[in-house]
A protein has these predicted regions:
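FIC/Doc superfamily catalytic core
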Residues: 1-121, 125-215
């Protein structure tokens, strides 16, 4: 309710892609996995967004034109796409080694993937999904970026190109994850306290009823 058709499509496609990744946590990072996830993620949204474009674009297929996003202009799309297999392979190797914290791996993958920007649309959503796929493979909590942190997230991505470092994105990933866990702990604490108060109320009511019955 209250959603545009595009927003409804995005929710549907995102659910399908997320479900697909959940069912394939035992699979390594490959181009086949990446393209199929993109196909599901943009199955309805891509055709809706590009229905009037002169250049055709299909879900699950790499871009055929150079890309830009906001004020960021990416390089030669063919040269960038050639680097995708190496990114996936090296990320999987580091994951298998177990020598680096999964959050660092997820952040570095995301930063490099967004730099490559290999698809016509959905690169941001796909990058975040694949980062969470990496985290879930190592049984780490999901990284959810709230709208209130969107500008900080974009700034951290831009720092990679501007300052040639991903430390800001790594720091952002850790802080965002910790903040979410703290919020969940607080919510569970409140639920527990409410449950205890409810049980005490029930016991008091029962005790009052027992006292009345003895009169």
């Amino acid at each position: 309710k209250g959603k545009t058709l595009l927003e409804a499509f995005e929710i549907l496609d995102h659910f399908q892609a997320y479900e697909y990744l959940l069912k394939n946590l035992d699979r390594p990072l490959t181009e086949e996995l990446l393209k199929e996830t993109h196909r599901l993620l943009t199955e309805h949204t891509l055709s809706y967004k590009t229905q009037y474009d002169e250049i055709p674009s299909n879900p699950g297929e790499y871009t055929t034109v150079d890309m830009c996003a906001g004020d960021t202009i990416f390089g030669d799309h063919e040269q960038l796409i050639k680097q995708v297999p190496r990114l996936l392979q090296s990320t999987q190797q580091v994951l298998d080694s177990g020598k680096i914290h999964p959050m660092i791996i997820a952040a570095r993958f995301h930063g490099f993937y967004e730099y490559l920007h290999p698809f016509r649309d959905g690169n941001g959503r796909l990058g975040r999904l694949m980062s969470n796929f990496i985290l879930l493979k190592k049984e780490q909590p999901l990284l959810i970026i709230p709208g209130s942190q969107r500008e900080e997230y974009i700034t951290a991505l831009k720092y990679i190109k501007k300052e040639r470092t991903d430390e800001f994105l790594i720091d952002f990933f850790f802080r965002t994850s910790i903040k979410r866990m703290e919020q969940e702990i607080e919510e569970k604490k409140n639920l527990t306290e409410n449950f205890i108060r409810g049980m005490e109320f029930v016991r008091n009511v029962k005790s009052s009823n027992d006292d009345i019955s003895e009169i």
